[in-house]
Curated annotation (Swiss-Prot):
Pathway: Lipid metabolism; phospholipid metabolism
Keywords: Cytoplasm, Lipid biosynthesis, Lipid metabolism, Phospholipid biosynthesis, Phospholipid metabolism, Transferase
Domain of life: Bacteria
Subcellular location: Cytoplasm
Listed GO biological process terms: fatty acid biosynthetic process; phospholipid biosynthetic process
Lineage of origin: Bacteria, Pseudomonadati, Pseudomonadota, Betaproteobacteria, Burkholderiales
Protein name: Phosphate acyltransferase
Protein species of origin: Acidovorax sp. (strain JS42)
Gene encoding the protein: plsX
GO cellular component, one term: cytoplasm
EC number: 2.3.1.274
Similarity comment: Belongs to the PlsX family.
Length: 343
């Protein structure tokens, strides 16, 4: 039985989204239990034999500063949910709340794995191969060193190995060009570290990739700093929404375009389903000594259910142990990288 702790109060919509998503998730996963954390009255919206309610008196808002969430709101639904993981009561925690607060609280309570300096946020983006490309970091670390990018690559490889059943997932380093000479000093050094990792057998490194490679499916994993990754994620979601809106507008122009829309509906529906970012909701906070997943703050019930499913799959497939094992195997490489003088 897999047990997930859910921050029911987080995100833009709170229980209005999280509870319907939890109800739907339970219907499809008979071997799962949920610990719902939030206000007492709010939690009454979902009573189930495989649900436990844990009352929390505070809520971390989307505008709360990290210090407020971490130091002052010690009985927040977000913190109490993560505490369930620390105490061994839940296999994973899920929240749609404030990203900075979630990362800070998770790092404070769970700590990082040996050999990992900073956790990273990883999620999937759809690609032209009919699958998905895993990208990290997506906003946890705005500024990164080359050593951090190497650590992200190691953890991302473990994630893809577990969730996509790939023995040797292919890693790419996001850059402004494929050539080795391109990029800033951090990227150039990271490229060198990743090539060394490939030679030692710790990683399957493709080389530098560009932004379009994320969607072409050139590699399984794209590594970047959190600033670039977050911009790429939000830009892709914006483009997908723009395309959907443009198609709807054009097919609604007159009777003939409406008829064309009816004829083309099966194809258009399949395409839009592949591009629907809600299907890829649920980002893993990698590098912690416990499983924590972040949902979009604006997620609807369908999207939040996907985050629950990702957390469930990660727990069922022992993601934490496999990340820990891969990091331990790469420990000499990571230690050697940290020991190198700054360029």
């Amino acid at each position: 039985m897999i047990t997930l702790a859910v921050d029911c109060m987080g995100g833009d919509h709170g229980p209005g989204v999280t509870l319907p998503a939890c109800r739907q998730f339970l219907e499809h996963h008979p071997d799962a239990r949920l610990i719902l954390v939030g206000g007492q009255d709010s939690l009454q919206g979902l009573v189930h034999e495989r649900v436990t309610h844990v009352v929390a008196s505070e809520v971390v808002t989307m505008d709360d500063a990290v210090e407020v969430a971490l130091r002052r709101k010690k009985d927040s639904s977000m913190r109490v949910a993560i505490q369930q993981v620390k105490d061994g009561v839940a296999h994973a925690a899920i929240s749609a709340g404030n990203t900075g607060a979630l990362m800070a609280i998770a790092r404070y309570l769970l700590k990082t794995l040996d050999g990992i300096d900073r956790p990273a946020i990883a999620t999937q983006m759809p690609n032209a191969q009919g699958g998905a490309t895993t990208v990290l970091d997506l906003g946890a670390n705005v500024d990164c060193t080359a050593e951090h990018l190497l650590q992200f690559a190691v953890m991302g490889s473990a994630l893809v190995s577990v969730l996509q059943d790939r023995d040797e997932p292919l890693v790419g380093l996001l850059n402004i060009g494929e050539e080795v000479i391109k990029g800033n000093d951090v990227i150039k050094k990271a490229g060198g570290l990743l090539r060394s990792a490939a030679k030692s057998g710790d990683l399957n490194f493709h080389g530098n990739v560009e932004g379009n490679d994320i969607f072409k499916g050139t590699v399984d994993i794209v590594v970047c700093d959190g600033f670039v990754g977050n911009v790429a994620l939000k830009a892709s979601e914006g483009v997908a929404s723009m395309i959907a809106g443009a198609l709807k507008q054009e097919f609604s122009r007159n009777i003939f375009t409406k008829i064309a829309a009816i004829v083309a509906y099966p194809v258009l529906s399949a395409i839009m389903k592949r591009m629907d970012h809600r299907r890829y909701n649920g980002a893993a906070l990698l590098g912690l000594r416990g499983l924590v997943f972040k949902s979009h703050g604006s997620a609807d019930a369908l999207a939040f259910e996907q985050a629950l499913i990702r957390a469930y799959d990660a727990a069922r497939n022992n993601l934490l142990d496999r990340v820990r094992a891969r990091v331990a195997h790469a420990a000499p490489l990571l230690a050697a990288a940290d020991a190198q003088p700054a360029s």
